[in-house]
Amino acid sequence: MVSQRVQALLNQLRTQGIADERVLEAIAQVPREKFVDEAFEHKAWENVALPIGQGQTISQPYMVARMTELLELTPESRVLEIGTGSGYQTAILAHLVHHVCSVERIKGLQWHARRRLKQLDLHNVSTRHGDGWLGWQARAPFDAIIVTAAPLEIPAALLSQLDNGGILVLPVGDEHQLLKRVRRRDGEFIIDTVEAVRFVPLVKGELA
């Protein structure tokens, strides 16, 4: 039995076009209040992005659901997330697939995200402190790659780590960003534009 706040959010997401019941169920199961600062807990189930420190944000639930839905995940999908952030998107993915790999360039965020995921008994996640532009070559190829910050162009390393038939979902651009879905098919990349979005930039390198 979900609370009224959770049900209200799920109804709003359905109205906004989210149709994948597995994604909606994951949204309902992951306690978003555990991934935000105490000062913002009262806003945790609102359909808004919230600050998490270090100039980063936790994406609004609609965008989390939309990007996750676009990945067309199955339980067997090998998933790479670029930008662990608070760990909220990671937790949603962990409810949908057997294992998630996630890269975060800011060490402090990675540490806190890993702690939160363990507290929620989500042990099917591997996190790594590193440069998201480079992906995670040692774990490639991936069936699905999701990027939660916006590069100016699609990183070549991520394209190379996408398996045949795989899907990459990411925002691209500077001031005017567009959400893109890239599907790899027989060595070619088919790119679709989904909608206008606003994300923090995907910065190269890693921070201690």
UniProtKB/Swiss-Prot annotation:
<comment type="similarity">
    <text>Belongs to the methyltransferase superfamily. L-isoaspartyl/D-aspartyl protein methyltransferase family.</text>
</comment>
<dbReference type="GO" id="GO:0004719">
    <property type="term" value="F:protein-L-isoaspartate (D-aspartate) O-methyltransferase activity"/>
</dbReference>
<keyword id="KW-0489">Methyltransferase</keyword>
<keyword id="KW-0949">S-adenosyl-L-methionine</keyword>
<feature type="active site">
    <location>
        <position position="59"/>
    </location>
</feature>
<dbReference type="GO" id="GO:0036211">
    <property type="term" value="P:protein modification process"/>
</dbReference>
<dbReference type="GO" id="GO:0032259">
    <property type="term" value="P:methylation"/>
</dbReference>
<dbReference type="GO" id="GO:0030091">
    <property type="term" value="P:protein repair"/>
</dbReference>
<protein>
    <recommendedName>
        <fullName>Protein-L-isoaspartate O-methyltransferase</fullName>
        <ecNumber>2.1.1.77</ecNumber>
    </recommendedName>
</protein>
<comment type="function">
    <text>Catalyzes the methyl esterification of L-isoaspartyl residues in peptides and proteins that result from spontaneous decomposition of normal L-aspartyl and L-asparaginyl residues. It plays a role in the repair and/or degradation of damaged proteins.</text>
</comment>
<dbReference type="GO" id="GO:0005737">
    <property type="term" value="C:cytoplasm"/>
</dbReference>
<keyword id="KW-0963">Cytoplasm</keyword>
<dbReference type="InterPro" id="IPR029063">
    <property type="entry name" value="SAM-dependent_MTases_sf"/>
</dbReference>
<keyword id="KW-0808">Transferase</keyword>
<dbReference type="InterPro" id="IPR000682">
    <property type="entry name" value="PCMT"/>
</dbReference>
<dbReference type="Pfam" id="PF01135">
    <property type="entry name" value="PCMT"/>
</dbReference>
